[in-house]
Swiss-Prot record:
Residues carrying covalently attached carbohydrate according to the record: N318
Region (Disordered): 34-55
Similarity field: Belongs to the GDA1/CD39 NTPase family.
Originating organism: Aspergillus fumigatus (strain ATCC MYA-4609 / CBS 101355 / FGSC A1100 / Af293)
Annotated Gene Ontology cellular component terms: Golgi apparatus; Golgi membrane; membrane
UniProt topology in membrane: Single-pass type II membrane protein
Gene that specifies this protein: gda1
One GO MF term: ribonucleoside triphosphate phosphatase activity
Alphabetical UniProt keywords: Glycoprotein, Golgi apparatus, Hydrolase, Membrane, Signal-anchor, Transmembrane, Transmembrane helix
Protein's UniProt name: Probable guanosine-diphosphatase
Pathways per UniProt: Protein modification; protein glycosylation
Disulfide bond entries: none
């Protein structure tokens, strides 16, 4: 009996073993991977401390978006982490890194014919992305590169070669999905988009958009190296005669924006060639042109120190200026600009800065700000709401102790003090690093005069108008990058997860 039972157990064990062998034999040699909807990460890693599931089950709980700002003076990356715990994405974290500054700029445009070198210049930024995006999210974290005014000025042929090289390197070296060409994944960003994205960033962080309340929005003035942008939501007074109220005129300046369930009718314009570095070049060039007109035959003055009222007193600056083909000084000249020996020449510098604005240009659609560009009057259509000025506006005022909010009259006083030279700088002694900044930058007087001219003479803001400077709001970087990254969280933004089967 015991032997029969033992035989039965042996037979049963043999059958089970055979079944296991058959299952192993028919199973696939590679593991099967589930498919994921377009734009969703292939991971179920939980959010840290916010919530355990997304508000919308069609969206992933956590999303990363990468944005490279290829500016005229350098390139910067923003690595954003969002959660979808609520009806709209919430920014949880941001990592920011920029290329090392170098003479002549470290932007993509500085590489000119070396397209591959330009593409490789982004590698340090991508290393930051590789370190800060967890491996399980990399294949579903979209990246876009937006070049601004500097590359725009390089011309269509050279700039396109650089853009193609950048796309190729990102697609072949790194695991992140690159936004498609059709959706502007690697492109020279249109100036109107640049300004509007900055407006979205600012008002999103201020909590003025994206929520249920229709609160008044803030204006945004962004001063870059090659261009400056203005974006605001004008409010037109009702007609006194009882007719239809005035509206924003049709044209390229009008930007209709749908965001967070609201419609915004914005005025925007990007003034190409009116960034701070472009303004410096224009002012220095105007001085050289005046000298050339006075002495067109004898050019020995080029080797002598050239007086410049926009250089600080008893300071000098070596400047390289390029001239177009056919110009007597083409292709370039190197000169030494020197400031006055004593006293302030702020008024003279202000005059040179105002001339660059071309206020006398024909205005085909009134009213105009400068250079013949239509703009609704800020005093009439945006008199009371907040005005945020950032980028170089911030960089040239905050180090000198300006508060987060000040009037244009206070900016005018600062400009006069700075242009007065070392004898006037005693008030900066108590501000850490201010005196070193002033002594290291002979063009401080020029920079502040251009800013003052742009805001007061160009945009026609009264001296009593208050402006706010900021580099961050709620500890988040300002600029256009966040505003441009928010749309990337949508499934229709031009990318799919880069999911590969494991061999």
């Amino acid at each position: 009996m015991a032997q029969t039972q033992r035989s039965r157990y042996l037979k049963t064990g043999a059958i089970v073993a055979a079944l296991l062998l058959m299952l192993l034999w028919i199973s696939p040699s590679r593991p099967m991977h589930p498919s994921f909807p377009q734009g969703q990460p292939s991971t179920s890693a939980p959010a840290k401390g916010k919530c355990s599931k997304p508000h919308d089950p069609k969206k992933p709980l956590i999303q990363y978006a990468l944005m490279i700002d290829a500016g005229s003076q350098g390139s910067r990356i923003h690595v954003y982490r969002f959660n979808n715990c609520g009806p709209s994405p919430e920014l949880e974290d941001e990592v920011f890194f920029q290329t090392e500054p170098k003479k002549g700029g470290s932007g993509l445009s500085s590489y000119k014919e070396d397209a591959e070198g330009a593409a490789k210049s982004l590698d340090p930024l991508m290393e930051v992305a590789m370190k800060n995006v967890p491996d399980e999210y990399k294949s579903c974290s979209p990246i876009a590169v937006k070049a601004t005014a500097g590359l725009r000025m390089l011309g269509p042929e050279l700039s396109q070669k650089i853009l193609d090289a950048v796309r190729n390197r990102l697609e072949t070296v790194y695991p992140f999905p690159v936004v498609s060409k059709e959706k502007g994944g690697v492109e020279i960003m249109d100036g109107s988009d640049e300004g509007v994205y900055a407006w979205i960033t600012t008002n999103y962080l201020l909590g003025k958009i994206g929520g249920p309340d229709e609160t008044p929005t803030a204006a945004v003035f962004d001063l870059g190296g090659g261009s400056t942008q203005i974006v605001f939501q004008p409010t037109f007074p009702k007609s006194k005669s009882g007719g239809m109220p005035e509206r924003l005129s049709e044209g390229d300046h009008k930007y209709d924006l749908q965001f967070g369930g609201r419609h915004f009718e914005l005025y925007q314009h990007s003034h190409l060639g009116y960034g701070l570095m472009a303004a410096r070049k224009a002012i220095h060039t105007s001085i050289i042109e005046n000298m050339l007109a006075s002495s067109p035959k004898d050019l020995s003055w080029l080797k002598q120190p050239i007086p410049n009222p926009c250089i600080g007193p008893e300071m000098e600056k070596n400047v390289t200026l390029e001239f177009p083909e056919g110009h007597k000084l083409a292709p370039e000249v190197q000169v030494t600009m020197v400031g006055p020996k004593v006293g302030s020449t702020a008024a003279q510098c202000r005059g040179l800065a105002e001339k660059t604005l071309n206020k006398e240009a024909a205005c085909t659609l009134a009213p105009c700000s400068f250079n013949g560009v239509h703009q609704p009057s800020l005093e009439k259509t945006f008199a009371r709401e907040d005005v945020y000025i950032f980028s170089y506006f911030y960089d040239r005022t905050k180090p000198l102790g300006m508060p987060d909010s000040f009037t244009l009259d206070e900016l005018h006083q600062l400009t006069s003090t700075v242009c007065g030279g070392e004898d006037s700088w005693g008030i900066f002694a108590g501000i850490e690093g201010a005196l070193k900044e002033l002594r290291d930058r002979p063009e401080w007087c020029l920079d502040l005069n251009f800013m003052m001219s742009l805001l007061h003479t160009g945009y026609e803001m009264p001296l009593s108008r208050e402006v706010k400077i900021a580099k961050k709001i709620k500890n988040r970087e300002l600029g256009w990058c966040l505003g441009a990254s928010l749309p990337l969280l949508s499934q229709e933004s031009g990318w799919t997860c880069r999911i590969k089967e494991v061999s």
